[in-house]
């Protein structure tokens, strides 16, 4: 039997270099962008159900189900919506268990966890809350209020610990969570939770920061972007970017 230390795998229960933790974060971001092989459904489902998108052509009957709010219980895509968002949550929890992870890295992991729980909340409301202390086994779903409270705590930590948005390097820092990204999502979740005063406070903080502004040209909207997870062009065309494009209607 060979006792050779792996040169490729990472043991998240041991101290890791900052660069190695960043690699784990990249995996978490990847699972946000592409929760499953049907990620266009994952990402667009709640938007279609909320009537934020007006479909031009139903290429999949599941999209029509979403738009008409008649998704049957045995729709196979429900399993993708439900379980695959937990991939990002699991990866975030792995990072939170790394002893050497910095507070900023933990903040980014908690942002990922918050966003994934929020996507699940948008679709199902009552969901199991999975944190870094979870061990395998059955877990009951939490109430909608408890889910939002959990998300808020994650985002408050993320806001307090992730680096601030650096306008001088905007095109790069837009690609990963920043303190301002947590602030923006926190405003949304406070609003969903009925806390209008706190939502307004977070939103006003972003507006008055002077770091973001409405662009006159929608094709050049860098000044508007707070956070934009981005992979390569092949991922964009092959997953959910194409279905929202002009070409999709043909």
Show the residue positions of the predicted features.
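Inward-facing hydrophobic residues that define packing positions of alpha-helical scaffold repeats
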Residues: 25, 89-92, 148, 155, ...
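Hydrophobic-face positions in mid-chain alpha helices that act as interaction patches
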Residues: 45, 53, 60-64, 200-250
